[in-house]
């Protein structure tokens, strides 16, 4: 992987970073959030995106961002170092329980069955949040648009009693980075509420990263105060980007008091700093 300072000035030096207007936080009730956005999106290829992810950025479609909130540092970028990862007893049971699932890796593409499962998942898990009303176009913009090396993985249960029949259980979008896999979004059968499909998906990604000789699986943001994010703290060791540096994180002891926007101004790839 080429270090950004060794890259030609263009296109890395052409990236600009902007702060959005405040908007309601989707993770913590009553909070106001802002994001720092990397632009222009067409210059963000897989190599540059790898460096941005290491600096705490994520993507939604072709929109690349990281939290830039005033007075709050609740969102901690986290990743699992796959060679050091040791599954706990519950995770081992989950892996064994779903080992018969058939995973198929494909390019990003639209499938009516995937969209139907997505809508069922949103209606059951995030009712009233807005995404439960996503149109097909919104679904495609959110999950199927990418300018980097991305894949769609579907997981199916095969029915041995029915020749060739299968049941779609889960769909996951992942990005392949220079130093790991980045979990973009996952949705699964909401009728199997205790199946731990999400946990199995991360375990599967860890195994894939190992097979590809990639050192990390990036899990996005962990928020201590958000119950929906609690599962990420169950993967040990877990590294977090705190004060601009990756370090092993102990979620029970993490000292993450609210601060001003200085954290969001942590060094950017290529020596950029600040926001326009």
From Swiss-Prot:
Annotated GO biological processes are: ubiquitin-dependent protein catabolic process via the N-end rule pathway
For this chain, the family text in UniProt reads:
Belongs to the R-transferase family. Bpt subfamily.
Q: Name one Pfam family in it.
A: ATE_C
Q: What is its main location?
A: cytoplasm
Keyword terms: Acyltransferase, Cytoplasm, Transferase
Task: Provide the catalytic activity annotation.
Answer: N-terminal L-glutamyl-[protein] + L-leucyl-tRNA(Leu) = N-terminal L-leucyl-L-glutamyl-[protein] + tRNA(Leu) + H(+); N-terminal L-aspartyl-[protein] + L-leucyl-tRNA(Leu) = N-terminal L-leucyl-L-aspartyl-[protein] + tRNA(Leu) + H(+)
Name the UniProt record assigns to this protein: Aspartate/glutamate leucyltransferase
InterPro entries the record matches? Acyl_CoA_acyltransferase (IPR016181), Asp_Glu_LeuTrfase (IPR017138), N-end_Aminoacyl_Trfase (IPR030700), N-end_Aminoacyl_Trfase_C (IPR007472), N-end_Aminoacyl_Trfase_N (IPR007471)
EC number(s) reported in the record: 2.3.2.29
Q: Its function?
A: Functions in the N-end rule pathway of protein degradation where it conjugates Leu from its aminoacyl-tRNA to the N-termini of proteins containing an N-terminal aspartate or glutamate.
Cellular component aspect of the GO annotation: cytoplasm
Q: Where in the cell is it found?
A: Cytoplasm
């Amino acid at each position: 992987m080429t270090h950004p300072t060794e890259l030609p000035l263009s296109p890395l030096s052409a990236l600009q970073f902007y702060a959005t207007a405040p908007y309601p936080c989707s993770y913590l009730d009553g909070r106001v959030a802002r994001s720092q956005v990397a632009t222009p999106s067409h210059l963000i290829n897989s190599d540059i995106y790898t460096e941005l992810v290491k600096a705490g950025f994520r993507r939604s479609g072709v929109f690349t961002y990281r939290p830039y909130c005033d007075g709050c540092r609740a969102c901690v970028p986290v990743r699992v170092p796959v060679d050091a990862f040791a599954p706990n007893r519950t995770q081992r049971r989950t892996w064994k329980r779903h080992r018969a699932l058939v995973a198929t890796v494909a390019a990003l593409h639209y499938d009516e069955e995937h969209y139907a499962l997505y809508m069922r998942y949103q209606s059951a898990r995030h009712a009233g949040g807005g995404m439960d009303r996503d149109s097909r176009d919104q679904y495609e913009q959110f999950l199927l648009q990418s300018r980097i090396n991305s894949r769609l993985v579907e997981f199916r249960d095969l029915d041995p009693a029915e020749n060739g029949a299968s049941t779609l259980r889960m769909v996951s979008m992942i990005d392949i980075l220079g130093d790991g896999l980045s979990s973009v979004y996952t949705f699964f059968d909401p009728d199997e509420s205790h199946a731990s499909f999400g946990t199995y998906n991360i375990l599967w990604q860890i195994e894939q990263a190992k097979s590809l000789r990639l050192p990390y699986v990036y899990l996005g943001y962990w928020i201590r105060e958000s119950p929906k994010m609690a599962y990420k703290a169950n993967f040990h060791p877990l590294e977090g980007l705190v004060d601009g540096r990756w370090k092993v994180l102990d979620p029970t002891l993490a000292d993450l008091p609210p601060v001003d926007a200085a954290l969001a101004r942590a060094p950017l790839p290529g020596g950029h700093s600040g926001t326009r």
